[in-house]
Amino acid sequence: MTHLRSRSGNVTHVMQGQLYISQTPGESLTCILGSCVAACVHDPALRIGGMNHFLLPGRDPHDTGSVRYGARSMEALIDALLHKGADRQRLNVWLFGGANVLGTQTGIGAANSAFAVDFTRAQGLTLRGSDLGGTRGRRVHFTPATGDPRVDYMQSDGIDDPIAGPLGAPGVELF
């Protein structure tokens, strides 16, 4: 995680495969998402919240406990909040990301989105809102103490942008 100070308070950038919780007034969490998903979870009575940022749906097939996978990431975030005194019945969840930013057919963004929604419902948590899917990346801002999320879309979806032009020159063979 990267912690920054600004005039408006502390900003913590939650990177892929990380999670962070806080109840510090003025602290803000942020992440940049493509096909990854972030859950922002908040207990309004305790004024505590957190954010995760997972890359892959489900469980780690090698059972390493990595929070890069949705199941472990979601469980770890909720457990950390409960450990600090949050009440599962009061937890509000917002889900973001899961885009198809590269225009490929892998479906990882859709799989991440479906996993996050299914997990939230299966755990009996309140899904307050979501902004999932599409073709554009997002920057998510979340204030854990107040539970206020905000999303900014990336400027270009990048799908129609060429990655590189043709390689080689007449008479040159590339291998």
Curated annotation (Swiss-Prot):
GO terms for molecular function: protein-glutamine glutaminase activity. It catalyses: L-glutaminyl-[protein] + H2O = L-glutamyl-[protein] + NH4(+). It comes from the Bacteria. It is an enzyme of class 3 (hydrolase). Its EC number is 3.5.1.44. Keywords: Chemotaxis, Hydrolase. This is Probable chemoreceptor glutamine deamidase CheD.
